[in-house]
Every structure is written in structure tokens, then in C-alpha cells.
């Protein structure tokens, strides 16, 4: 259901059913038994999260019955996670989801470990347990499960993310800096730069950590096989256009970033931006893009406008001569240039 219409209808039906169940005053144990069968056996995922959404209608007795049914099923299905039977795996997943709801509702960390951790077959389970603990404000437990996860999988990005978040929630920004820096070191990306900023600003030491981040990224750009893509990204993120330009022209960077940089410098440095557009034309023409000729004309138009405004028309004329000489055997392209009077 790509349009989402069926999902909306199911959600609406669930709401109506919940309200009707509350008004009908049905025996809570019978209601729990019936709803449990629907949630665990339906192929359309109808009436999901019943333990939470129908809490009022179920009442204490109904919720107890729901929990009992799920726990009984889990004893049978516990080891079916790798079963070849898809129906069995699906039912196990749904029962586990119900027991996770119960654990969250009861703020039961031990149960969360069992049903969210689910044997910790994958390192991501540690992050999931820590997140679930954080969701129910069990922050000490969240830190503990992050630490356990990192002991097993020190490179797991998600565990580091959760640890930063929980440290900040606990009012420990200085302790959040270590995992935040670990993540930044790996990618030097704007999202991790922002995560580092959040921790450092909370610890009132952003100036120091900002310098460290740029120094580290600059050092990486000086590597023998590296270009300045990551450094340019950070400077662009910080609106430091001239620093980005210097890094890009000295060490090179990804063409998409150079194009972004040219677009943002058009007003202040029109000739340099035009030069970027003109130099990008060969890449466009040598690609397999369907509309590469139209894109070439678009780049030429932008360069022409910028150079005319900067009284550098001769540069554009020279670029046209070279383009016609190099690609004169492309009649469709030549026709498009002729149509523009070039």
C-alpha cells in the first residue's frame, strides 16, 4: 500500500474498535483472548499494540490475561527465530512485540532485556535495549547496556549514538564527548559535527572541540590519498565559503560539493563560479545521463550570465570554441548551441 490509504483505514478501524470495546463493557478476559488471537494471527497486522491502545477497555484483568497468553506462547516460540517456517517466525515476532509492550508499560528492565535483546544475536540489540531503557527513563540501565554493547562491538555506530543521548539526558555532557568524538573521527560529517557540538556546548567547551574537529579533518585531508571533501563539507556546513573554496582548490573535493560551493559564491565571485560550471561540462558530456545536452546548455547559460556581468565575456567565447572543437561531431549538441546563438 504505497499510498498509505489501507494503513489509514486500519488505524481508523482500530480507533473505532477501541472505543466500541470500551462502551460495550465486554468481559475483559474474553475480550483479551479475542483481541490476542487477532493481533497474533492476522496477516494484515490488524490491531497492533493492543496491550497499550486498548488498556482502558481491557482493564487490569484483561491486561493480565493478555500478558499470560503472550508469555505462554513465548515459551513455545522462544527458539523459533531461525525457523524455516515463515508463519512461525512471524507469530514469534508478534508475540515478542507484545511482551516488549508489556515490559515498557511496566517499566521492567529485566523483561526489556529478554524481549528486546532477544538473545543479543546482533550487536544492534544492545542499542535497542539501551534505547528502550531510556524511553522508560531507566537511564542507569541504558548506560549499562551501552557499555555492554561497546565491549562486544566497539565500532557499532548506533550504540555510540544512544550513549551520547543518554549521557546528555543524565546531565553528563563531558562524558558524552568521548562517544561523540569517536563517531566524528570516523566520518568527519556534518551530522556528527552537530552531535559533537551539542555535547560540547552543554559542557561549555565548544570552542576547543570545534578547533579540534577542524584540525583533525584538515589533517585527514593532507593524507597521501585524500582530497578535501570532508573539510569542504564542514566549511560549507558552517557557511565558511572562502575557507571551503581554498580547501577545494588546494586539495580537490567531490564535484557535487564544488558545484554547491560555486552556486553559493555566484554573487561574490561570479567568474570563479562560472569557471566551475564550464569545467564541469566535460564530466556531464562524458556521462550517460539522459539529458546531458540540456544540462550542458544550462551550465553554459549560467556561466555566460555570470561572465557577462563580470565583464569577462572573452572567457565564455573561448570555452565555446573549445567545446565545439572537442564535441563538434555531436549534432544534437551543436544544434542546441546554434539555437542559442552560440
Predicted regions and their residues:
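Eukaryote-biased, non-catalytic alpha-solenoid scaffold regions
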Residues: 1-342
Amino acid at each position: 500500500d504505497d499510498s498509505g490509504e489501507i494503513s489509514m483505514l486500519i488505524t481508523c478501524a482500530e480507533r473505532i474498535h477501541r472505543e466500541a470495546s470500551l462502551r460495550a463493557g465486554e468481559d475483559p478476559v474474553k475480550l483479551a483472548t479475542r483481541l490476542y488471537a487477532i493481533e497474533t494471527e492476522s496477516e494484515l497486522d490488524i490491531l497492533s499494540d493492543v496491550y497499550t491502545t486498548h488498556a482502558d477497555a481491557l482493564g487490569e484483568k484483561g491486561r493480565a490475561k493478555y500478558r499470560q497468553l503472550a508469555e505462554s506462547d513465548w515459551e513455545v516460540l522462544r527458539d523459533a527465530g531461525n525457523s524455516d517456517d515463515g508463519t512461525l517466525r512471524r507469530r514469534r515476532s508478534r508475540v515478542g512485540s507484545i511482551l516488549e509492550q508489556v515490559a515498557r508499560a511496566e517499566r521492567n528492565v529485566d523483561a526489556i532485556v529478554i524481549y528486546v535483546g532477544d538473545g543479543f544475536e546482533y550487536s544492534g540489540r544492545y542499542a535497542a535495549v539501551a534505547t528502550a531503557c531510556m524511553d522508560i527513563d531507566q537511564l542507569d540501565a541504558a548506560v549499562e547496556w551501552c557499555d555492554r554493547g561497546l565491549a562486544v562491538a566497539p565500532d557499532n555506530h548506533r550504540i555510540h549514538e544512544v550513549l551520547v543521548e543518554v549521557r546528555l539526558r543524565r546531565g553528563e555532557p563531558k562524558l558524552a564527548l568521548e562517544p561523540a568524538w569517536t563517531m566524528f573521527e570516523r566520518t568527519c560529517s556534518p551530522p556528527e559535527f552537530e552531535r559533537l557540538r551539542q555535547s560540547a556546548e552543554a559542557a561549555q567547551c565548544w570552542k576547543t572541540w570545534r578547533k579540534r574537529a577542524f584540525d583533525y579533518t584538515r589533517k585527514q585531508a593532507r593524507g597521501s590519498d585524500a582530497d578535501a571533501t570532508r573539510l569542504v563539507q564542514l566549511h560549507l556546513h558552517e557557511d565558511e565559503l572562502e575557507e571551503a573554496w581554498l580547501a577545494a582548490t588546494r586539495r580537490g573535493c567531490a564535484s557535487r560539493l564544488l558545484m554547491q560551493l560555486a552556486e553559493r559564491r555566484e554573487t561574490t565571485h561570479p567568474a570563479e563560479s562560472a569557471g566551475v560550471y564550464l569545467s564541469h561540462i566535460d564530466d556531464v558530456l562524458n556521462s550517460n545521463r539522459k539529458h546531458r545536452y540540456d544540462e550542458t546548455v544550462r551550465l553554459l547559460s549560467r556561466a555566460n550570465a555570470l561572465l557577462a556581468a563580470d565583464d569577462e565575456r572573452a572567457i565564455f567565447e573561448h570555452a565555446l570554441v573549445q567545446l565545439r572543437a572537442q564535441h563538434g561531431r555531436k549534432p544534437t549538441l551543436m544544434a542546441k548551441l546554434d539555437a542559442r546563438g552560440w
